[in-house]
Regions:
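Short linear regulatory motifs enriched in tryptophan with gly/pro/ser
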Residues: 1-181
Length: 181
C-alpha cells in the first residue's frame, strides 16, 4: 500500500498466465485479508511522470459493479480521468514491459487504497505463493482512508513519535468497532 506509513506490503509469486481479475480475486484480496467482490478495484500501468488523474490513462477493471454497494466501475473515468477497459481477459504477463516495470492497483475506490505492484521476475509455474510481507491490512469499510489508518498505527505502535500523524479523535471513535477497542 503506497499511502500508509509505515508501509503495508506483500510479496507474492504468481503465474504469468493469471488474468488481472484473477490477480485481484485469488491473490491480492486474500493476501490483504479482504473479501473478493466486495469493493470495486482498478489497475493501471505506471509510467514515470504520469499522474493518477491524467486524462490519457487507461484503467483496467471489471466493466460492471460486482455488488450493489460498490461504485459502478464505469464511473472510474469520471472520477479519476482516462478510460476503462475490462480486465476479465487481460493476462498479467501482458501488463508488464519487463522486470522492474510497475502496475498500480486501487482497491475500494471510495477510500482509494493505492498499491504499487512491481514485477521482480517472471514465474513459469501457475502456482500462487505468499512469500513475505509486513503490516496488518486495512479492515474492510474502514473510515478515513490512508490518513486515519496511519493515525491508528501511530497510536498503537510503541514508538509513535516516528510517525508524523496525530489525531484529535480517540482511536475508539472510529476504529473500535473493527478491532474491538
Amino acid at each position: 500500500m503506497q499511502t500508509t506509513r509505515p508501509r503495508v506490503w506483500r510479496r507474492v509469486r504468481v503465474g504469468s498466465r493469471l488474468t488481472l481479475r484473477q490477480l485481484h480475486d485469488v491473490v491480492l484480496c486474500p493476501a490483504m485479508g479482504w473479501k473478493r467482490a466486495y469493493h470495486s478495484y482498478a489497475f493501471r500501468e505506471l509510467r514515470p511522470g504520469e499522474r493518477h488523474d491524467d486524462e490519457s490513462v487507461v484503467w483496467f477493471g471489471p466493466g460492471e459493479s460486482q455488488l450493489e454497494q460498490t461504485v459502478d466501475m464505469t464511473q472510474v473515468p469520471f472520477f479519476y480521468g482516462g478510460a476503462l477497459v475490462k480486465d476479465k481477459d487481460l493476462r498479467v504477463d501482458s501488463m508488464f514491459e519487463g522486470e522492474g516495470s510497475r502496475l498500480a492497483y486501487v482497491y475500494d475506490l471510495g477510500q482509494y487504497w493505492w498499491h504499487s505492484i512491481t514485477l521482480e521476475s517472471y514465474c513459469k509455474e501457475d502456482s500462487i505463493e505468499l512469500l513475505d510481507g509486513w503490516g496488518q491490512a486495512v479492515p474492510e469499510d474502514s473510515d478515513g482512508g490512508s490518513w486515519n489508518y496511519s493515525v491508528l498505527l501511530s497510536e498503537l505502535l510503541p514508538d509513535a513519535s516516528r510517525l508524523p500523524f496525530r489525531s484529535p479523535l480517540s482511536i475508539n471513535d472510529w476504529w473500535g468497532k473493527y478491532w474491538g477497542l
